[in-house]
Amino acid sequence: MISELLERLFTRTPPSRTTAKERLKLVLAHDRTALTPEILDNLRRDILEVVSRYVELETEGLAVSLESDQRTTALIANLPIKRLKLSPEDAPLPENFPPENEAKER
């Protein structure tokens, strides 16, 4: 608790130049992938919904963004995890994917 307070007091906010640069990168990434802000918001909501089925997420520090270099665009999800909700054996398998054993046999 004290460490969090000290971190908040002594952590510098990024300069506006850095913030503007990150926003420009995001705009360029959106343009390259042709994702509208609505689609990105829906994607962010869906990712959080699915991940939340399995783990409890920390609300502070949640971030989903697009990052691009010259050749590729990546969706980056920073999802701080508090704890697991289910054991891995109890977690349901996605309907679109065969169980791990069947996938190896093919």
From Swiss-Prot:
Prevents the cell division inhibition by proteins MinC and MinD at internal division sites while permitting inhibition at polar sites. This ensures cell division at the proper site by restricting the formation of a division septum at the midpoint of the long axis of the cell. InterPro entries: MinE, MinE_sf. GO terms for biological process: cell division; regulation of division septum assembly. Keywords: Cell cycle, Cell division. The lineage of its organism: Bacteria, Bacillati, Cyanobacteriota, Cyanophyceae, Acaryochloridales. Belongs to the MinE family. This is Cell division topological specificity factor. Residues 87-106 are annotated as: Disordered. It comes from Thermosynechococcus vestitus (strain NIES-2133 / IAM M-273 / BP-1).
